[in-house]
Amino acid sequence: MMSDVAERIDAKIEGLGDWRRETLGRLRALIKQADPEVTEELKWAKASNPLGVPTWSHAGIICTGETYRDKVKLTFARGASLEDPSRLFNSSLDGGTRRAIDFREGEGIDEKAFKALIGEAVAVNLAKSPKP
């Protein structure tokens, strides 16, 4: 059974109606493949973005998915702490905590490297989360 949040994220993605729909939809599928235990949420709803920002978490935020006119941006909450041997991060590189990947129209996704980055983000979150 699909959750209300999953349905709202579906609606947000479907509402894009262009290359961004396919890109964000594919990234979402890859996140779920990389971490079947991921939690999907919508955060930070506001008048200009009433559905909010799709957010994927596991022991803390992994990444958020935002769409702009010319790009789909995935921002990794602890990106500065992650190994990125494939050099996927191409935005927010000077931040002390976050890192982002901007996907533009016509660009491919290195699916293997992307899923490895998601796995690393989960591992970092689990290592930093308080133990019960």
Question: Language-model segments: what does each one mean?
Answer:
Residues 1-132:
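Charge-dense, helix-prone N-terminal extensions
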